[in-house]
């Protein structure tokens, strides 16, 4: 199951603790990428946050991984389930 997770930090919440959490995100991501749980990691230009693509076995696993994130308590999350468009059957055009 793949999910696009967009996390954003409110500017009003930027503090020393938040900055430390953000700086820990790279180290947090490395083992997740090595294990294949995170398959893409992006910065959203003009935003305080990022977009990560997770590949997990269940909703519960995704929730557990998000809760382990250093920015979990400082961020707002949007989670979108993804479907692989290359494996979907193509419907013929309507006549």
What are these regions (language model features)?
Residues 1-95:
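Conserved, structured core segments of small domains
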